[in-house]
Amino acid sequence: MATRIAPSADVSQDAALGEGTSIWHLAQVRERAVLGRDCIVGRGAYIGEGVVMGDNCKVQNYALVYEPARLADGVFIGPAVTLTNDHFPRAVNPDGTLKSASDWEPVGVTIDEGASIGARAVCVAPVHVGAWATVAAGAVVTKDVPAHALVAGVPARRIGWVGRAGEPLVPAEAGPDGAPRWRCPVSGTLYQEAGSESDTTIREVTH
């Protein structure tokens, strides 16, 4: 399937778009951006210079994905989401002169496979969002998000776990070692917690 670019979209000739990718009205895709197959970039969205996106990503209307963000396969970026690239932003240098590209080094947000960022959430670079995690609408992410975590609030904190289907996991019988377990209500997949209270992760288990 060929790529589709709306007449009002601004796509650099130096950008690379995978087969089947669609760029909708008023969206901008900057120089050296690389988008995989079957991606969708919604109306008014911005994809920064050199941003890399995997296959089957969705960037919804008016989202801002600043360079050098890295999005793996199947990432969802909700409407009006912002992925920042400057941890200490200033318009001017200490001497009052206007900052140029040579006066600062951009840092990017990294989002792993299948993760979702809800509408109007902000991810403050250089955070890393783990695979299949969900960031709730309006959250401000200032710390790394573990895989399968559900985070919400300002600043974002983990309030639960989610499975690949995106729905919150429900409590299940504890594992043989007493570790908390969770089950996906859609697929039935079982997960078990590991790590310390301040650094908890989750992984799939077979029994």
Model regions: which residues?
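Flexible, glycine/small-residue-enriched loop-and-beta-strand segment within the central core
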Residues: A2-P7, S22-H128
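Short Cys/His-rich Zn2+-coordinating modules
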Residues: N56, Q60, L98, E113, ...
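Internal alpha/beta core interface subdomains
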Residues: A131-T134, V140
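Cys/His-enriched microdomains
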Residues: R158-W161, W182
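Short cysteine-rich clusters marking metal-coordination/redox-active sites
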Residues: G163, C184-S187
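Short, non-ligating residues that shape and space the ligands of small metal-coordination modules
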Residues: P171-A172, L190-A194
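Short linker/helix segments within small regulatory modules
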Residues: E173-P180
